Amino acid sequence: AFTHFKHRMYLDSGLQVVKKEALNLQLGWLNRFGRTAIFVKNDIKLILRNKRSKMTIWVSIGFLFYGLLFFTDSSGGLYNAPVWKIFAGIFVTGGFLFTFGQYVPSWDSSYYPLMMSQNIVYIEYLNAKWAMITIATMASTVLGSFYIIFGWDVYAAILTGAIYNIGVNGHLVLLSGAFIKSPIDLTSTKKPFGDKQAFNAKTLLLILPKLFLPMILYFIGSLYGGEWVGYM
């Protein structure tokens, strides 16, 4: 034991320089989209560099398999009604929309006052967020193409959910984000979404129209022309 401590009792051993390779993303190919690219690149870097925002990617991947609950017999026939296919389509393609888009502009809460003091057109800021949601929704739609094995009607429901998420829910989440005041601390390790509880009753109430409104529209359409008319 004496020999062990003797060879390790040197101050220099604790002063060694630790080298870490920094993640430097240029993303120059996004410059073709003009000023919107500035915010898109900032969001991509935010997602990849912080544990809080990086979780949105993993949750979105998990949402891709949520449809198995509806399109297989694992639920014991509980969700056999055609209207539940639309519900599944919204979820399968809307993982990123609900986990990231639902909390705009809370993701930027740490530097939001500084950002708003700059010469920034707010519509460009929102367009960038919508572009992120659109790209993620399209990616989820492509990755969810394995649902074709359950039938073309199943994948049609997923495509319908994707179109609705891009055209309607994508705008609704950005609108509802103005009513969510909870900031997200990207550096905190106390809670999944920072020091304050970001998911609350208000958040839940804002989510409900995004889920059940397309189901109601599908039901009305299917009454007049069947399942495929409901998708349209």
Describe the role of every protein-language-model region.
Residues 112:
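A glycine- and small/hydrophobic-rich beta-loop-beta segment
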Residues 1-109, 122-232:
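Hydrophobic alpha-helical transmembrane segments of membrane proteins
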Residues 116-121:
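Short helix-to-coil transition segments within interhelical loops
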